[in-house]
Amino acid sequence: MREYKVVVLGSGGVGKSALTVQFVTGSFIEKYDPTIEDFYRKEIEVDSSPSVLEILDTAGTEQFASMRDLYIKNGQGFILVYSLVNQQSFQDIKPMRDQIIRVKRYERVPMILVGNKVDLEGEREVSYGEGKALAEEWSCPFMETSAKNKASVDELFAEIVRQMNYAAQPNGDEGCCSACVIL
């Protein structure tokens, strides 16, 4: 059984913990309690292949931003979360993606851009088109989710497993360390 390390990144209050807890336990956290760092494990079967996800739910506050390099270094897949009802959280996600690329020294890191809180459609500040365009620019999948309603939560974690499986394939895009030798 494959084991993968998934890191969930985003600003404070975007729903990183709510998404993770909804996926792992099937329950929604109503009260906002800022996270420093939480670690979860869950077995998941994607495309008939069992895997174990080690999910690191990170702090969204700048006070703990210095710890991000270590999270990124150890992570294999990244879920970048912003809140659909907070334009600033959408802007804040861009330097986080840049940090992943800087630490990994590779542009094709398995990641998914996620607009959370789709249940608050009437308060939306970030359009679907804006999220989709940014994901296309980054060449990564894009999803809108709701931890509260469990909308696309399981699909999100299944998709990051697919991204990591693809990256791990010998004929997949292996990045900086792949080489072709002709003798």
UniProtKB/Swiss-Prot annotation:
The keyword Ubl conjugation applies. The modification Cysteine methyl ester is found at residue 180. It catalyses: GTP + H2O = GDP + phosphate + H(+). GO terms for molecular function: G protein activity; GDP binding; GTP binding; GTPase activity; protein domain specific binding. A motif (Effector region) lies at residues 32-40. It is found in: Midbody; Cell projection, Lamellipodium membrane; Golgi apparatus; Recycling endosome membrane. GTP binds at residues 10-17, 57-61, 116-119. Keywords: Cell membrane, Cell projection, Endosome, Golgi apparatus, GTP-binding, Hydrolase, Lipoprotein, Lysosome, Membrane, Methylation, Nucleotide-binding, Palmitate, Prenylation, Ubl conjugation. GO terms for cellular component: bicellular tight junction; cell-cell contact zone; cytosol; extracellular exosome; membrane raft; midbody; plasma membrane; recycling endosome membrane. Activated by the guanine nucleotide-exchange factors RAPGEF3 and RAPGEF4 in a cAMP-dependent manner. Nucleotide exchange is also specifically stimulated by RAPGEF5, RASGEF1A and RASGEF1B. It is a lipid-anchor. The keyword Cell division does not apply. It comes from Sus scrofa (Pig). The effector domain mediates the interaction with RUNDC3A. Residues 181-183 form a propeptide. Small GTP-binding protein which cycles between a GDP-bound inactive and a GTP-bound active form. In its active form interacts with and regulates several effectors including MAP4K4, MINK1 and TNIK. Part of a signaling complex composed of NEDD4, RAP2A and TNIK which regulates neuronal dendrite extension and arborization during development. More generally, it is part of several signaling cascades and may regulate cytoskeletal rearrangements, cell migration, cell adhesion and cell spreading. It holds the Pfam family Ras. Its main location: other. A lipid is attached at residues 176-177 (S-palmitoyl cysteine). This is Ras-related protein Rap-2a. Belongs to the small GTPase superfamily. Ras family. Interacts (GTP-bound form) with RUNDC3A. Interacts with PLCE1. Interacts with ARHGAP29, SGSM1, SGSM2 and SGSM3. Interacts (GTP-bound form preferentially) with TNIK (via the CNH domain); the interaction is direct and recruits RAP2A to the E3 ubiquitin ligase NEDD4. Interacts with MINK1. Interacts (GTP-bound form preferentially) with MAP4K4. Interacts with cytoskeletal actin. Interacts with RGS14; the interaction is GTP-dependent. Ubiquitinated; undergoes 'Lys-63' monoubiquitination and diubiquitination by NEDD4. Multiple lysine residues are probably modified. Ubiquitination requires TNIK, prevents interaction with effectors and inactivates RAP2A. Ubiquitination by the ECS(RAB40B) complex leads to RAP2A localization to lamellipodia plasma membrane, activation, and regulation of sorting at early endosomes for recycling to the lamellipodia plasma membrane. Palmitoylated. Palmitoylation is required for association with recycling endosome membranes and activation of TNIK. One of its GO terms (biological process) is regulation of dendrite morphogenesis. Its EC number is 3.6.5.2. A lipid is attached at residue 180 (S-farnesyl cysteine).
